[in-house]
Amino acid sequence: MSALGAVIALLLWGQLFAVDSGNDVTDIADDGCPKPPEIAHGYVEHSVRYQCKNYYKLRTEGDGVYTLNDKKQWINKAVGDKLPECEADDGCPKPPEIAHGYVEHSVRYQCKNYYKLRTEGDGVYTLNNEKQWINKAVGDKLPECEAVCGKPKNPANPVQRILGGHLDAKGSFPWQAKMVSHHNLTTGATLINEQWLLTTAKNLFLNHSENATAKDIAPTLTLYVGKKQLVEIEKVVLHPNYSQVDIGLIKLKQKVSVNERVMPICLPSKDYAEVGRVGYVSGWGRNANFKFTDHLKYVMLPVADQDQCIRHYEGSTVPEKKTPKSPVGVQPILNEHTFCAGMSKYQEDTCYGDAGSAFAVHDLEEDTWYATGILSFDKSCAVAEYGVYVKVTSIQDWVQKTIAEN
């Protein structure tokens, strides 16, 4: 007569409370489970099954069943004496079935606050017969989340009114960065995505010789975003024609986390630098007392007529008669890559240290802020009538190409 084995499974909740034992092991603990009766020509094999509490599930390669061996060890066939673990089960309950129908399992990917889906599909994936999650538009390619740009939580109020400018409300200019040179000179930079910023070539060359390279410059800079959040610089890239196009890019070692204090500004798909259009410029530059400010300020400035701006800085009313004269003793770069913005009606203006900041324009239809220009000439300080900005649309191809290659 063949031997007959019997298995007793004790259901346990996340941990082993007690086990029964045969003749060779200790008697049962006082959990109320009776000792099983013996049978002729057979024996009792002691085993337990680990189970988890509600909303938890087993994390194990085995089935959770452990058998007591001759050495009084609890052993699982798949994992030996390694105990299973319980982990949170965030799965959905099985939906009820319907007559003449079936349940199609699908999930929708969504992004956290201040991020949006970057995908050709709608983010909805369906489980196919091969147990693969498939999107109708992109197949098994997963979507990505990218930073929202140009959507400040507390946008600047035009009713509120850096030279004598207005204090920034919380998060009005989350793209504004503060850059400090190795000789402790403060300038500006503008966040345009999670890892790249625009600034001027002049800012990058501060206290460096003309022979300095991008590799020489990067280690000498200190950069802050948000509320004095220090970020590490990986490299700087100068525009190939930076003597005429006063611009450079900064790449960070790590992507920044986007939130209400840190958010890139959008790059425009059209030119917003129309005469009379008002933009906002923020910065930590010098104030009316010619001292650097500890508080981010901003000012509203109108785009000026380019010809008038050129005549103003040439010191002549006739454009053909070029002279080195300038109301502030320094000649700005003025060409097809630049535009000018005049002082506000309150005689407010940008000043030393504001260069690298964005001329931010609010597109009311899209409710989005765009970097129309990057402040290049910040020496006006309410003495000259115009500040000079590098036009972002004229450098956008270079910006996108540089980011893609680096």
Swiss-Prot record:
It is found in: Secreted. Expressed by the liver and secreted in plasma. It comes from the Eukaryota. One of its GO terms (biological process) is acute-phase response. Keywords: Acute phase, Antibiotic, Antimicrobial, Antioxidant, Disease variant, Disulfide bond, Glycoprotein, Hemoglobin-binding, Immunity, Repeat, Secreted, Serine protease homolog, Signal, Sushi. Residues 318-323 are annotated as: Interaction with CD163. Residues 31-88, 90-147 form the Sushi domain. Glycans are attached at residues 184, 207, 211, 241. GO terms for molecular function: antioxidant activity; hemoglobin binding; serine-type endopeptidase activity. Pfam families: Trypsin. Residues 162-404 form the Peptidase S1 domain. As a result of hemolysis, hemoglobin is found to accumulate in the kidney and is secreted in the urine. Haptoglobin captures, and combines with free plasma hemoglobin to allow hepatic recycling of heme iron and to prevent kidney damage. Haptoglobin also acts as an antioxidant, has antibacterial activity, and plays a role in modulating many aspects of the acute phase response. Hemoglobin/haptoglobin complexes are rapidly cleared by the macrophage CD163 scavenger receptor expressed on the surface of liver Kupfer cells through an endocytic lysosomal degradation pathway. It is linked to Anhaptoglobinemia: A condition characterized by the absence of the serum glycoprotein haptoglobin. Serum levels of haptoglobin vary among normal persons: levels are low in the neonatal period and in the elderly, differ by population, and can be influenced by environmental factors, such as infection. Secondary hypohaptoglobinemia can occur as a consequence of hemolysis, during which haptoglobin binds to free hemoglobin. Congenital haptoglobin deficiency is a risk factor for anaphylactic non-hemolytic transfusion reactions. This is Haptoglobin. The gene is HP.
